[in-house]
């Protein structure tokens, strides 16, 4: 049963939506308000020095893995080139309407009316379904701080940052730390008279490449930290794995590595919080070009800032790297928290006719592959090959998932869309029917090692199920080097077997008690 589907946005999630929904035989129209695809990466105003903090194998879709390339972190230009190749390879361009801004989306009976604007013309078109792929980065979030309205210096959000030379010779305060903030603060420190970084707490910051490893395959997102087996084991194993690394950090002779290690220790367990995957900031901190102030801002004055520790600094400019807030101006639906949605995709009362794609932030791994998995599920729902649970069941799942993720990431509860990449991907893959069948060590030992002990690449979900690419996926997975030594593999296999045995014994014990 084919559907007419409107996709709003031709960024990473929108491209995935067009591809997966057309694969399902649906008639797809994608509206993009900009003149090109790629979302934030296509924005000419975004600073040119931007490099992705997720490696190319996790930022690529599962049906077009760039295995002809070495593992690397793409620049903005390189990633746009990949997306362009993807669009051309799968003939996606004919579905995208550029310079078409969606103004209003309204439900009328069992249809959706989408009103869009192109140049000076406004039109309305009817669809069976709407997939919102507009992304997180729509409405900059500015903190409400005492005295900010009285401050007379320049105020800018990272969304508007373009050129470090605008801050040459100035005293600059940067507020907040994420991937872009690490880049922006580092750049400004090169030309500023003084650069201060204000943070409320010590954040967990990870390097793109794992320290003390010569193997270029050993990046933060292609380490055993993103393997299926590590994420099947209790958190005490995570702590044991990372403790040795932290100890190496804090005893390093390199000041920037040592400082990062000290921050990591003070930030708390990394598996319980959002992690900034950009270590660039620590070199200017070590060199004295960036002065961190941990604790937060008390107030602003006419030409100064006062921190909660009592320190007062005169400043000429402020750059807020404080993220974005959800914004859907074309919808009359209010969503305060994506965790209120089933799988962070569906408003239960509206069914699958309205979906939100790509509004999940994985602690590790990339948003594009999560968006792709969501769209594979959406395509099955649209075709009638799958059905959403009942209303009460969806609300039960929402309640359970919300509690689970809030407990999992209790240190950074403000990052309300944060999930464990491995667990979330598996949960949706089960709904799609594309969970990989993991063989025993005796049947297919090499594939088992790649599926359990190597990174949980999206290609794993192309081995089985609908729209599988068994040969291509298997070839890629087997070609990737083992990231764990055989002693570590055996150790984890024994630990997993012991965990399964204990679970079985507990279950048997409960059955005996209930008799």
Curated annotation (Swiss-Prot):
SUPFAM superfamilies, per database record: FAD/NAD(P)-binding domain
Q: Does the keyword Disulfide bond apply?
A: no
Q: Which Gene3D superfamilies match?
A: FAD/NAD(P)-binding domain
Highest taxon of the source?
Answer: Bacteria
Instruction: State the UniProt keywords alphabetically.
Output: FAD, Flavoprotein, NADP, Oxidoreductase
What's the name of the protein?
4-hydroxybenzoate brominase (decarboxylating)
Query: What does its activity-regulation comment describe?
Result: Activity is abolished in the absence of either bromide or NADPH, while a partial reduction in activity is observed upon omission of FAD. Activity does not require the addition of a flavin reductase to regenerate FADH(2) in situ.
Q: Which cofactor does it need?
A: FAD
Catalysed reaction(s) here are:
2 bromide + 4-hydroxybenzoate + 2 NADPH + 2 O2 + 5 H(+) = 2,4-dibromophenol + CO2 + 2 NADP(+) + 4 H2O; bromide + 4-hydroxybenzoate + NADPH + O2 + 2 H(+) = 3-bromo-4-hydroxybenzoate + NADP(+) + 2 H2O; 3-bromo-4-hydroxybenzoate + bromide + NADPH + O2 + 3 H(+) = 2,4-dibromophenol + CO2 + NADP(+) + 2 H2O; 3,4-dihydroxybenzoate + 2 bromide + 2 NADPH + 2 O2 + 5 H(+) = 3,5-dibromobenzene-1,2-diol + CO2 + 2 NADP(+) + 4 H2O
* First-tier enzyme category under EC: oxidoreductase
What are the protein's GO molecular function terms? flavin adenine dinucleotide binding; N,N-dimethylaniline monooxygenase activity; NADP binding
The family this protein is said to belong to: Belongs to the FMO family.
| Summary of the function given for this chain in its UniProt record | Brominase involved in the biosynthesis of polybrominated aromatic organic compounds. Catalyzes the bromination of 4-hydroxybenzoate (4-HBA) to 3-bromo-4-hydroxybenzoate, followed by bromination and decarboxylation of 3-bromo-4-hydroxybenzoate to 2,4-dibromophenol. Can also use 3,4-dihydroxybenzoate, with lower efficiency, forming 3-bromo-4,5-dihydroxybenzoate and 3,5-dibromobenzene-1,2-diol. Can utilize iodide in vivo leading to the formation of iodophenols, but cannot use chloride.
Q: What happens when the gene is disrupted?
A: Deletion of the gene abolishes the production of bromophenol-containing species.
What Enzyme Commission number(s) appear in the record? Answer: 1.14.19.55
Q: Which organism is it from?
A: Pseudoalteromonas luteoviolacea (strain 2ta16)
């Amino acid at each position: 049963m084919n559907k007419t589907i409107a996709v709003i946005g031709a960024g990473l999630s929108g491209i995935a939506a067009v591809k997966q929904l057309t694969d399902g035989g649906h008639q797809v129209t994608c509206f993009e308000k900009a003149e090109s695809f790629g979302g934030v990466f296509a924005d000419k105003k975004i600073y040119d020095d931007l490099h992705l903090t997720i490696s190319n194998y996790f930022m690529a879709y599962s049906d077009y893995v760039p295995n002809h390339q070495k593992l690397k972190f793409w620049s903005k230009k390189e990633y746009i080139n990949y997306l362009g190749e993807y669009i051309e390879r799968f003939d996606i361009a004919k579905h995208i309407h550029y310079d078409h801004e969606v103004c209003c989306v309204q439900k009328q009976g069992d249809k959706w009316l989408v009103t869009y604007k192109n140049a000076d013309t406004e039109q309305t078109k009817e669809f069976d379904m709407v997939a919102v792929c507009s992304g997180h980065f729509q409405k900059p979030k500015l903190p409400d701080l005492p005295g900010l309205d009285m401050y007379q210096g320049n105020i800018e959000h990272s969304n508007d940052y373009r050129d470090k030379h605008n801050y040459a010779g100035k005293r600059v305060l940067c507020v907040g730390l994420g991937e872009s903030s690490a880049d922006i603060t580092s750049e400004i420190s090169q030309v500023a008279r003084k650069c201060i970084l204000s943070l409320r707490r010590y954040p967990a910051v990870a390097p793109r490449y794992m320290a003390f490893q010569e193997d270029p395959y050993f990046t933060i997102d292609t380490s055993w930290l993103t393997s299926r087996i590590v994420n099947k084991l209790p958190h005490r194993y995570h702590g044991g794995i990372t403790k040795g690394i932290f100890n190496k950090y804090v005893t390093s002779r390199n000041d920037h590595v040592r400082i990062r290690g000290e921050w990591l220790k003070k930030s708390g367990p990394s598996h319980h919080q959002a992690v900034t995957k950009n270590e660039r900031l620590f070199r200017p901190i070590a060199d004295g070009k960036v002065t961190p102030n941990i604790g937060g801002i008390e107030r602003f004055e006419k030409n100064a800032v006062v921190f909660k520790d009592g320190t007062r600094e005169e400043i000429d400019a402020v750059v807020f790297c404080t993220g974005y807030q959800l914004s859907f101006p074309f919808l009359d639906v209010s969503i305060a928290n994506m965790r209120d949605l089933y799988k962070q995709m569906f408003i239960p009362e509206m069914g699958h006719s309205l979906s939100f794609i790509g509004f999940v932030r994985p602690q590790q791994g990339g948003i594009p592959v999560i968006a792709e998995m969501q769209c594979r599920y959406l395509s099955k729902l649209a075709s009638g090959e799958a059905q959403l649970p009942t209303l009460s069941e969806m609300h039960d799942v929402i309640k359970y998932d919300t509690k689970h993720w809030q407990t999992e990431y209790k240190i950074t509860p403000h990052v309300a869309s944060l999930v464990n990449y491995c667990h979330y991907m598996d949960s949706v893959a089960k709904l799609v029917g594309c969970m990989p069948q993991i063989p025993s060590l005796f049947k297919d030992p090499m594939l088992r090692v790649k599926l359990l002990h190597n990174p949980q690449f999206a290609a794993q979900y192309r081995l089985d199920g609908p729209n599988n690419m068994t040969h291509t996926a298997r070839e890629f997975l087997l070609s990737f080097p083992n990231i764990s030594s055989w002693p570590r593999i055996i150790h984890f296999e024994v630990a997993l077997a012991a965990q399964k045995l204990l679970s079985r014994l507990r279950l048997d014990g409960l059955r005996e008690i209930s008799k």
